[in-house]
Design a protein with these regions (language model features):
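Small/polar-rich, solvent-exposed N-terminal microdomains that initiate assembly or binding
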Residues: 1-47, 73, 99
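Short intrinsically disordered coil segments
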Residues: 49-53, 75-78
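Short, basic, helix/turn surface patches
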Residues: 44-51, 113-115
């Protein structure tokens, strides 16, 4: 599955990968970690009135206690994903963190799945 592929790629950096919003208030934030969110999965191309591909749209977040790492790791993730067939535009954007000790950055990525 596409989501599993994305998680496996991000895990190669050695940081935990979680679904966005799944850390509980009681759970301590890891020092650095990725989260992902599937924004939508739309039909791509069609043939004979049926979809023959799908476009997966994800947001990837990286949070860390090290602001410099936040800026570099999201670009590293972008480069890895592009090498593996993902479409990634730009260098990302800042995102808020629920913990004052962490800063975050995110990128939006697309993947075309062919049937």
């Amino acid at each position: 599955m596409i989501k599993s592929n994305l998680i496996d790629l991000l895990k190669t950096f050695g940081y935990p990968v979680k679904l966005q919003g799944t850390l509980t208030k009681e759970e301590a934030y890891p020092e650095s970690f990725f989260t992902i969110w599937n924004n939508e999965t739309l039909d791509g191309n069609h043939y004979d009135d049926e979809p023959i591909s799908y476009i997966w749209d994800f947001t990837i977040y990286f949070y860390s206690t090290d602001p410099a790492l936040v800026n570099t790791k999201i670009v590293d993730a972008k480069n890895l994903l592009k090498q593996n067939g993902w479409v990634v535009a730009g260098k990302g954007y800042d995102v808020p963190s629920d913990e004052p000790t962490h800063t975050g950055r995110a990128i939006d990525v697309l993947y075309k799945e062919n049937n």
